[in-house]
Each structure stands twice: as C-alpha cells, then as structure tokens.
Amino acid sequence: VDRLLAYHAGIFRALIAAGELQAEDPDTLAMQYVAPVLTLIGICDRQPEREAECLDMLRRHVALFFRMVHKKEPLQ
C-alpha cells in the first residue's frame, strides 16, 4: 500500500506543479484517491458477482475525484 500511495502522490505532485490540480497535499490526495479503489478490489475479491457494480462505482469515484481537485479557471 505504501508504494501505491507514494506512486499516486508523485503523480499528483506533478499535476499540481503543472497547474492541472488544486494545490493540496499530494499525500492526502493519494490516500483519498486510492482508499476507495482498494475497498472496491476487496469487494470484488470476496464477491466476484459484484464486479460490474464495483466497476461502475470506480468510474463514478474517479470522475468525482477529478471534478473535486481539478484546478478551475477563474471566470473572466
């Protein structure tokens, strides 16, 4: 889990530096992004019949996460 979090924190650091994401703590962003993914993987491991449901939840999670952290341009 530590390597997974460090990997995603690095991605978020780069996206923040490029001005794509809001300047928030990349380590916290990584935890917020990864934790639901690991939860969904755990559900699929224990209940494979829920895979389609979990994939839909994953899609919605990723979309919501990036809507929340994407750097919005100021209105002019």
Task: Tell me the role of every PLM-derived stretch.
Residues 6:
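Alpha-helical elements of the RecA-like P-loop NTPase motor core of helicases
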Residues 9-18, 26, 32-76:
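C-terminal peripheral helix-coil segments that are non-catalytic and often amphipathic
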